[in-house]
Amino acid sequence: MNFTRIIFFLFVVVFATASGKPWNIFKEIERAVARTRDAVISAGPAVRTVAAATSVASG
């Protein structure tokens, strides 16, 4: 019984210190969307080149 309380207390202490900085889910989503947007923008010239090569190859 005491061992369980000690483990629980240690878990609470570790969790309290680890969550000192709250995790903002909307900020993480915003970063993921920005990375996706930047990847699409940077892939644009390559996609145009492949499309042009395909149209040249097909006729």
UniProtKB/Swiss-Prot annotation:
Whether Secreted counts among this entry's keywords is: yes
Any one GO CC term of the record: extracellular region
Disulfide cysteine pairs (residue numbers): none
Q: Give the highest taxon in the source lineage.
A: Eukaryota
Cite the propeptide residues by number: 21
Q: Which residues carry this modification: Serine amide?
A: 58
Q: Where in the cell is it found?
A: Secreted
A GO biological-process term? defense response to Gram-positive bacterium
Q: Which range is the signal sequence, renumbered to this chain?
A: 1-20
| Protein family according to the UniProt entry | Belongs to the cecropin family.
The job of this chain, per UniProt, is described as:
Has antibacterial activity against Gram-positive and Gram-negative bacteria.
Protein name, entry field = Antibacterial peptide enbocin
The organism's taxonomic lineage, starting at the top: Eukaryota, Metazoa, Ecdysozoa, Arthropoda, Hexapoda
